[in-house]
């Protein structure tokens, strides 16, 4: 018996990440090859983006995806999020030349307050929300705080791109297959302050930390490479990393929906106070997923170097939260 279609809302649907994302959702890569989807696509109420969205929908039609049960174009989050089972909040205001971070936070604050309120009003009560648009952790925090009638656990931020970048660097360093890396995590903010942590990681049961055994490489090569990878891609490509961000969003949502079989992944989730992270802070943590729920990996030892890195990324996040407090 075929499954009932689920509703997937995507914001910024005509943008670069949206374009790299929608065809993969419609083909079944995110929710499984037996799960029909209805795409509810949101773009800003401006002629250019709305017209571009129509073009993307024409292409989606032309793929004749068996799992694409329907799609709709929207310019208002109140209609785009109606009964949504999944919401990928991709659209955000990028930082323009000469724009101060505070200004960026304020502009995005307004966007994510409105979207949080709309989700609160019309989305499924079990909606799974992933914020991709930067600053992702703080935008997710704003959306969560603007949706008091939805469970906090429904809101997540994307740290998976940092996680995948870290895995790829470790695979290159060790000469091993990226698929064999387990128990890797990224703590904190999706920003250059994030802390990619391979102290517990294994490859085919062997310790990655022992394999690499080079703290100087960790502190001076690995962490800066992962932290500044986005900037390096803009420098090389002239555009930001869209396909790899879309891929990370698919990974994050697929694992959350379908489970990780006991494997660790990284998700930005609202803290309940574990590891000394204040409650409600949207923070990257190691989690496992099953039955549509994520579960924090608890009881990991935090050494002095790790604590210093975690404190640094937390401090940045708390500064961002303070910068949007007046909006909430």
Curated annotation (Swiss-Prot):
Pfam families in UniProt: Ldh_1_C, Ldh_1_N
SUPFAM superfamilies: LDH C-terminal domain-like, NAD(P)-binding Rossmann-fold domains
Protein EC: 1.1.1.37
Source organism, top-level taxon: Bacteria
Catalytic residues identified in the record: 190 (proton acceptor)
Residues noted as binding NAD(+) in the record, renumbered to the chain: 12-18, 108, 115, 132-134
Enzymatic reactions: (S)-malate + NAD(+) = oxaloacetate + NADH + H(+)
Class of enzymatic activity (EC top level): oxidoreductase
Function of the protein: Catalyzes the reversible oxidation of malate to oxaloacetate.
Protein name per Swiss-Prot or TrEMBL: Malate dehydrogenase
Organism: Polaromonas sp. (strain JS666 / ATCC BAA-500)
């Amino acid at each position: 018996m075929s499954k009932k279609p689920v509703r997937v809302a995507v914001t910024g649907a005509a943008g670069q990440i949206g374009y790299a994302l929608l065809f993969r959702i419609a083909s079944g890569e995110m929710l499984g090859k037996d799960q029909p989807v209805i795409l509810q696509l949101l773009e800003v109420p401006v002629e250019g983006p709305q017209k571009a969205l129509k073009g993307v929908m024409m292409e989606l039609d032309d793929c004749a995806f068996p799992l694409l049960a329907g799609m709709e174009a929207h310019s208002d989050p109140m209609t785009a999020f109606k009964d949504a089972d999944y919401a990928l909040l991709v659209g955000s205001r990028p930082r323009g030349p000469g724009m101060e971070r505070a200004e960026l936070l304020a502009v995005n604050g307004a966007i994510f307050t409105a979207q949080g309120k709309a989700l609160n009003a019309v989305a499924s009560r079990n909606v799974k929300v992933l914020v991709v648009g930067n600053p992702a952790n703080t935008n997710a925090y704003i959306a969560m705080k603007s949706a008091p009638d939805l469970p906090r656990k429904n809101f997540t931020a994307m740290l998976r791109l940092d996680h995948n970048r870290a895995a790829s660097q470790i695979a290159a360093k060790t000469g091993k297959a990226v698929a064999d890396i387990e128990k890797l995590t990224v703590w904190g903010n999706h920003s250059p302050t994030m802390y990619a942590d391979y102290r517990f990681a294994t490859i085919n049961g062997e310790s990655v930390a022992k394999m690499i055994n080079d703290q100087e490489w960790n502190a001076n090569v690995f962490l800066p490479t992962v932290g500044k990878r986005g900037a390096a891609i803009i420098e090389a490509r002239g555009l930001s990393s869209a396909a790899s961000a879309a891929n990370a969003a698919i990974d994050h949502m697929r694992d959350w929906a379908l489970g990780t079989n006991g494997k660790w992944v990284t998700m930005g989730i609202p803290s309940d106070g574990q590891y000394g992270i204040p409650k409600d802070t949207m923070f990257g943590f190691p989690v496992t997923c099953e039955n549509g729920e994520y579960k924090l990996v608890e009881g990991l030892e935090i050494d002095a170097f790790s604590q210093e890195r975690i404190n640094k990324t937390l401090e940045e996040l708390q500064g961002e939260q303070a910068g949007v407090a007046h909006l909430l």
